[in-house]
Amino acid sequence: MAIERTFSIIKPDAVAKNHIGAIYNRFETAGLKIVAAKMLHLTKEQAEGFYAEHSERGFFGALVAFMTSGPIMVQVLEGENAVLAHREILGATNPAQAAPGTIRADFAESIDENAAHGSDAVESAAREIAYFFSAEELCPRTR
């Protein structure tokens, strides 16, 4: 098993409903360690930059508007096969299709406001982590 880092966002809908602590509990119960975290209110430019790969898709404007609608929590999680483990905890992108007990099944209302984001691969995790965190902000958990 490989120790990896992955990037995670708790989106404005879940922050507004005070689900941060419950979601962090899910991460930690699954064996993922939080090695960096901060609350941000994204600017339009930050959201457009982060989601640039979707800029030509029809939902881009709505996505940017949603992600700038309120504060978010961004965090870096570390653990064995962290990318896959985190995505399993999140559940399907569409909460209507997410397995019971997953974050999206329990905390999301719709595919558009689906509570959380998780990197889909080690490579995208590295890119997404670097977008929000400097190397100095990452705190390895050795105990």
Swiss-Prot record:
Gene (name only): ndk
Residues that, per the record, bind ATP: 11, 59, 87, 93, 104, 114
SUBUNIT field: Homotetramer.
GO molecular function: ATP binding; metal ion binding; nucleoside diphosphate kinase activity
Gene3D superfamilies named in the record: Nucleoside diphosphate kinase-like domain
Disulfide-bond pairs as recorded: none
Function: Major role in the synthesis of nucleoside triphosphates other than ATP. The ATP gamma phosphate is transferred to the NDP beta phosphate via a ping-pong mechanism, using a phosphorylated active-site intermediate.
Protein name: Nucleoside diphosphate kinase
Organism: Shewanella sp. (strain W3-18-1)
Enzyme Commission number(s): 2.7.4.6
Lineage of the organism: Bacteria, Pseudomonadati, Pseudomonadota, Gammaproteobacteria, Alteromonadales
Cofactors: Mg(2+)
CDD domains in the cross-refs: NDPk_I
